[in-house]
Amino acid sequence: MAFHYPNGQPYSNHETKQPKKQGRHTSPTTLYGKRGMSLEEEINDSNQYYRLRDAAVIYKKPTPIQIVKVDYPARSQAVIKEAYFKQASTTDYNGIYQGHYVDFEAKETKNKTSFPFQNFHQHQIDHFRACLQQGGVCFVIMKFVPLQRLFVYPASLLITQWDNQATGGRKSIPLAAIVADGFEIQYQLNPSIPYLEAVDQLIARHHKGV
């Protein structure tokens, strides 16, 4: 079945699953992302861990698909032959955590010193803005791939810095600012990305009016 992006380019999945290897272990003091797993897969894995333990109910939103061509090899069967990914209108994840509506994006960069705004879209910023106005807990999980560092960064700060672009502001968020204003997450065994610990701090900061 052929899938296409909204710009008409064909979709190809270059990710390959790596078999688990036995033997050599990394240092017990340092944990990195699970080998062969993308950031999205790591978060999905963590969300499942949280759901199974009744800690939170958070899911990845499905990507809308527009079906273009369908074949009917039999009257009771339908086979999708061609489809397009529609442009997403909101963010990657949402759900409920301790009575709070949670909404967030997951982004990664190969940069080492800043996180570029080109990773975001205006519709995502607008969605964050609307959710915050309703009292939602909104943030971005940012990953600096070369550094293997993860952060929960408040959407309120992202929106302010995004808006500042129009008046000559930076086109990226410096790593130093993310370290100062965000919440760093350390990889661990289960869940691999324990981001709810950072969300607790984000909620506490909000209640203090910081």
Curated annotation (Swiss-Prot):
Q: Could you tell me what reaction this enzyme catalyses? A: Endonucleolytic cleavage at a junction such as a reciprocal single-stranded crossover between two homologous DNA duplexes (Holliday junction)
**Protein location:** Cytoplasm
The free-text note explaining how the cofactor binds reads: Binds 1 Mg(2+) ion per subunit.
Pfam families referenced in this protein's UniProt entry, alphabetically: RecU
User: What's the superkingdom here?
Assistant: Bacteria
Instruction: Indicate the annotated site residue(s) for Transition state stabilizer.
Output: K107
Molecular function (GO) terms for this protein are: endonuclease activity; magnesium ion binding; nucleic acid binding
Which cysteines does the record link by disulfide bonds? none
Q: What is its EC number?
A: 3.1.21.10
UniProt cross-references to InterPro entries, sorted A to Z: Resolv_RecU (IPR004612), Restrct_endonuc-II-like (IPR011335), tRNA_endonuc-like_dom_sf (IPR011856)
Offer a single GO CC term for the protein. cytoplasm
Q: Which cofactor does it need?
A: Mg(2+)
Keyword set, alphabetical order: Cytoplasm, DNA damage, DNA recombination, DNA repair, Endonuclease, Hydrolase, Magnesium, Metal-binding, Nuclease
> Where is the stretch described as Disordered?
1-34
- GO BP term, pick one: DNA repair
Q: Which residues bind Mg(2+)?
A: T90, D92, E105, Q124
Q: What role is this protein assigned?
A: Endonuclease that resolves Holliday junction intermediates in genetic recombination. Cleaves mobile four-strand junctions by introducing symmetrical nicks in paired strands. Promotes annealing of linear ssDNA with homologous dsDNA. Required for DNA repair, homologous recombination and chromosome segregation.
Q: Which family does it belong to?
A: Belongs to the RecU family.
Q: Which HAMAP family match?
A: RecU
What is the name of the protein in this document?
Holliday junction resolvase RecU
Which source organism does the UniProt entry give? Latilactobacillus sakei subsp. sakei (strain 23K)
Underlying gene: recU
